[in-house]
């Protein structure tokens, strides 16, 4: 068997899982072997095997805000999961582990440390997560998507995104020849964002019909009927879908996006070159979505609107002030932030550490 064996540690949310999948592809294209360490009964348990990657799981869940009993059990749980992770590393003869975040990353990383296996960390958010903060002390390489995610020195590589998004034409080429009302894409993630589903239709109803943007609105799971009913009741035309399967076309055709500010969303916006009205999820750990959003806003690639300030009236005021020229400028500024070779950069750093 040729190639080295890498263990990717990522779980809990798509923001950890999908960048790791992009790195897995980059490693496998180079002839290396990949296994995945995840949690039982998790998103990664449903997604990762579909990509032909061997999945190993630990019985571990989060410790933040989960009650005194779970925290009292933490030392025992950690001991048990670290031992299991050591067994997995030995079994597959892992030569380097790559941590992307999520509960499973810490016991997997600690197991690697105890076995003398090199650790590489990739942090997707502007504020480093708990597992990655701890593991960064032992990591051979610390990589991050946003400047200053860690207090110590590391490597800025961005967040891995799909190549077909990075390969979209530049904003000036996409915007050329566009006329009439703006076309706005609304996405709140695969589960949707209730506050966007409620407020966006109300805001559009406050605008004169002749200046209302054209809306392409992803409702999220099990929310399409209510969203479409709200638009209809307000007399506002919009194209609503439960889930957008072709995000490349959606990004290509949009003038602007209204969305949350998860790390993967920011990475895709910058890769595509799209400005955004960002409404960070207010309950994200360490308020990392607000920090993510500021990254784009500071580059004049969009606006940050805290959820506490999101009203139909405020949103209508913002939408009414926009024009295609401003959206194009935001899109061009967003594209300057893109780091399209992120997956390859992470893979090459890990290969060097495993040498």
From Swiss-Prot:
Keywords carried by this UniProt record: Cell cycle, Cell division, Cell inner membrane, Cell membrane, Cell shape, Cell wall biogenesis/degradation, Glycosyltransferase, Membrane, Peptidoglycan synthesis, Transferase
Q: What pathway does the UniProt record associate with this protein?
A: Cell wall biogenesis; peptidoglycan biosynthesis
Its membrane topology, per UniProt?
Answer: Peripheral membrane protein
Which InterPro entries does the record match to this protein?
Answer: GlcNAc_MurG, Glyco_trans_28_C, GlycoTrans_28_N
Which terms under GO biological process does the entry name? carbohydrate metabolic process; cell division; cell wall organization; lipid glycosylation; peptidoglycan biosynthetic process; regulation of cell shape
Q: Which Pfam families match?
A: Glyco_tran_28_C (PF04101), Glyco_transf_28 (PF03033)
The UniProt entry lists the main location of this chain as membrane
Binding-site residues for UDP-N-acetyl-alpha-D-glucosamine, renumbered to this chain: 13-15, 125, 162, 190, 244, 289
Gene Ontology CC entries for this record: plasma membrane
Q: Where in the cell is it found?
A: Cell inner membrane
Q: Which Gene3D superfamilies match?
A: Glycogen Phosphorylase B (3.40.50.2000)
Listed GO MF terms: UDP-N-acetyl-D-glucosamine:N-acetylmuramoyl-L-alanyl-D-glutamyl-meso-2,6-diaminopimelyl-D-alanyl-D-alanine-diphosphoundecaprenol 4-beta-N-acetylglucosaminlytransferase activity; undecaprenyldiphospho-muramoylpentapeptide beta-N-acetylglucosaminyltransferase activity
Highest taxon of the lineage: Bacteria
* Keyword Protease annotated: no
**Annotated family:** Belongs to the glycosyltransferase 28 family. MurG subfamily.
Q: Briefly state the protein's biological role.
A: Cell wall formation. Catalyzes the transfer of a GlcNAc subunit on undecaprenyl-pyrophosphoryl-MurNAc-pentapeptide (lipid intermediate I) to form undecaprenyl-pyrophosphoryl-MurNAc-(pentapeptide)GlcNAc (lipid intermediate II).
Q: What is this protein called?
A: UDP-N-acetylglucosamine--N-acetylmuramyl-(pentapeptide) pyrophosphoryl-undecaprenol N-acetylglucosamine transferase
Q: List the source organism.
A: Neisseria gonorrhoeae (strain ATCC 700825 / FA 1090)
Gene behind this protein: murG
């Amino acid at each position: 068997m040729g190639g080295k064996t890498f263990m990717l540690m990522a779980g809990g949310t798509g923001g950890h899982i999908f960048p790791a999948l992009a790195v897995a592809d980059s490693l496998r294209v180079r002839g290396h072997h990949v296994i995945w360490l995840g949690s039982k009964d998790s998103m990664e348990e449903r997604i990762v095997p579909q990509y032909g990657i061997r999945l190993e799981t630990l019985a571990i869940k989060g410790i933040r805000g989960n009650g005194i009993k779970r925290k009292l059990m933490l030392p025992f749980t950690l001991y048990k999961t670290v031992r299991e992770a050591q067994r997995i590393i030995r079994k597959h003869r892992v030569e380097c582990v790559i941590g992307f975040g999520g509960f499973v990353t810490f016991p997997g990383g600690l197991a690697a440390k105890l076995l003398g296996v090199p650790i590489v960390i990739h942090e997707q958010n502007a504020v480093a997560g708990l597992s990655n903060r701890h593991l960064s002390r032992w990591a051979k390489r610390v990589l991050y998507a946003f400047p200053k995610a860690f207090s110590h020195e590391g490597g800025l590589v961005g967040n891995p995104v799909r190549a077909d998004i990075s390969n979209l034409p530049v904003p000036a080429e996409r915007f050329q020849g566009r006329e009439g009302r703006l076309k706005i894409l609304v996405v709140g993630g695969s589960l949707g964002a209730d506050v966007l589903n409620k407020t966006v239709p109300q805001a559009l109803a406050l605008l004169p019909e002749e200046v209302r943007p054209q809306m392409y609105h992803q409702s999220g799971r099990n929310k399409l009927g209510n969203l479409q009913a709200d638009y209809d009741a307000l007399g506002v035309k919009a194209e609503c879908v439960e889930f957008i399967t072709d995000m490349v076309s959606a990004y290509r055709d949009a003038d602007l996006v209204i969305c949350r500010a998860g790390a993967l969303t920011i990475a895709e916006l910058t890769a595509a070159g799209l400005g955004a009205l960002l409404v960070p999820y207010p309950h994200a750990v360490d308020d990392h979505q607000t920090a993510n959003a500021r990254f784009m806003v500071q580059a004049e690639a969009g606006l940050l609107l805290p959820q506490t300030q999101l009203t139909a009236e405020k949103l209508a005021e913002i939408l009414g002030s926009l024009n295609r020229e401003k959206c194009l400028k935001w899109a061009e500024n967003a594209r300057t932030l893109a780091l399209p070779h992120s997956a390859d950069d992470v893979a090459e750093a890990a290969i060097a550490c495993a040498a």
